[in-house]
Each structure stands twice: as C-alpha cells, then as structure tokens.
C-alpha cells in the first residue's frame, strides 16, 4: 500500500526560534524542557509563533484473538464494556479530556461484540476482533492495510477541520501482548525486555503470557518486514494508530505519543518512514515493562513519568497543558528589549 509523504522538518527556522526563546525575560535556559518543546512546536508548525488548535485524542478500540490464550487478567468482553464507558463519559480519558478542553473521538476498530450505533462512536470496524496469533496470523494483509487506511482517514478529517495537535489512545484486552511481539520482532530485543504485566497479571499469569508469546514468535519466524509483522501480531487498533501517525506527520500536525501500545504502533510507522518521529512529542514513560526500552530505541525523553499503565490516551491528555504552556510563553512572554529589562552581564 502507499503512504502519505512526510516532509522532514526545515531547520532554517531554528535560529529565529532559538533567538526568540533566548530573548524572553528569563535567564537562558531557565524554562528547561519547555524551551526545547517550544522550539519543536515552532519547527513542526513552521512558524516562530506557533498556535495550537483543536487538540484532539482519538481512542481506537479493538479485540485480540490472543486473549483466548489467557494472556490478560481481564476477559475480552471488557473491551466492549469500556467502549460503553467511554461513550458514557466515565473513563479516565473522558475526565482528563474534559478537564483540559481536548476533543475526544471513540473509534470501533474491531471490537469482538458489534456495538450498537451511538452518538460519539465512529464505526471503522474491520472484523469482530483479530484471530489468535498464537495459532495463526492475527490479520490478513488486506485487513491490516484497511485498518491503516481507516486510521489515516480519521486523522485527515480532523486536519481538514483545523486540528493541528493530536494524540492517539487505545482500548483492547490483550493488546500489551500484541505490542510486546511487535516490539520484539522489530527491535530484536529479548522478549523479557518487551513483556510486562499488562492489566495486572500475577507471577503465574506473567509466566503463561511469556510462554504463549515465545511460542507465537517461533511459529511466525518468517514475519520480518514491518507490514508482515503488523499483520501477524498486531491489532486493528494498533494498525489504525500506525496509519494515523503517518497521516498526522504528513499533515504537519503535532503528535502526542501516549503509552506502550501507542509507542509500539509508532514503531511500525517509524519503520515505514523514519521522518514520522520529528513530529512526535513523547508524553510519558509508562509503568509497563518494555516502554522505557522502546522509548530508548527512539532516543526519546518523555515529558512525564507518572507510572501510568492505563492507555486510552491518558498520558497524552495529561501532557497537553505543557504543550499549551510552551506555546504560550513563546507567544506571550515579554522580551528583554520590549520590557526594558537588562540582560545578563557579559
């Protein structure tokens, strides 16, 4: 399949942005990470006065056949139940989105039990969940391509409506297993470095999960190319996020990268086009084992470390005020020359 072209960031604006940041009424570097964040926002949006518009989080939900192998502490029906919770406004991502003025969209990417039409629910379902990759590939290549295309389409719709800052969340029981296999196969790291307790497995459950994933990786040893790995181990929500990352970067949007699952989807996107990373703000490092190692693969320094392990886009929503603050100081803070404040002595 064809993917949108991602334009590398133009560094020509960097000196102007850095000079504007340094001229603010503060000691050089005194706003720390906010300064590098403001610089990145300006480079992504191509202006020394970046304005962040219509912040949005899209939550993609889908079920995983590998849940039937007992790799999660929760049954598969929780995915559909949590989607209903999203639609009722009762989940953590709903609370944080309301708190911070973020638009929230819920997408049925392929929940096992078909969901009734409801206000706020976007139907992009590919199938009634993926197949069990411990036995057979999770998706056909055609399904993976359709999911990526759907994710791209959702992003393009928001871009056309003026959104220029977007994050992606997910809901899918057993999706940490899918993410761990994607991570292991695409990075070559030991599975032990990629696998965690997910929604709260005990020691016996973690051992069972590791055994299932080890067998699955051996079964599908031929899956090596990024799209093959995605189709073999991924979920519909992960594939949609991978497509969404590519479309957002191609649309020159600021991308809020959430937790382990979202970062695994980004790994697929990055293997397809490395330029996608230039548009990404890594919002946090989750408590899920594997996320830190995956962030290290990207050389990423996340904004927050709150031991989150929820997904849903919650880390992206919590980090949004930092981006808003970075843009605000760049646009609104007085300069030494304008305020009549003396600069530091040579």
From Swiss-Prot:
- GO BP annotation list: cobalamin biosynthetic process
Q: Please explain the role this protein plays, according to its UniProt record.
A: Catalyzes the synthesis of alpha-ribazole-5'-phosphate from nicotinate mononucleotide (NAMN) and 5,6-dimethylbenzimidazole (DMB).
Q: Which residues form the active site?
A: 312
Q: Which residues form a coiled coil?
A: none
User: Could you give a GO molecular-function term held by this entry?
Assistant: nicotinate-nucleotide-dimethylbenzimidazole phosphoribosyltransferase activity
Give the reaction(s) catalysed. 5,6-dimethylbenzimidazole + nicotinate beta-D-ribonucleotide = alpha-ribazole 5'-phosphate + nicotinate + H(+)
State the organism named in the record: Cupriavidus necator (strain ATCC 17699 / DSM 428 / KCTC 22496 / NCIMB 10442 / H16 / Stanier 337)
Family named by the database record:
Belongs to the CobT family.
Question: InterPro entries from the entry?
Answer: Nict_dMeBzImd_PRibTrfase, Nict_dMeBzImd_PRibTrfase_bact, Nict_dMeBzImd_PRibTrfase_N, Nict_dMeBzImd_PRibTrfase_sf
Pathway(s) annotated for this protein in UniProt: Nucleoside biosynthesis; alpha-ribazole biosynthesis; alpha-ribazole from 5,6-dimethylbenzimidazole: step 1/2
Q: Keyword set for this entry?
A: Cobalamin biosynthesis, Glycosyltransferase, Transferase
Q: Which NCBIfam families match?
A: cobT_DBIPRT, PRK00105.1
Q: Name the encoding gene, please.
A: cobT
Enzyme Commission number, as recorded: 2.4.2.21
Its recorded name reads Nicotinate-nucleotide--dimethylbenzimidazole phosphoribosyltransferase
Entry keyword annotation includes NAD: no
**Mind telling me which HAMAP family this protein's record contains?**
CobT
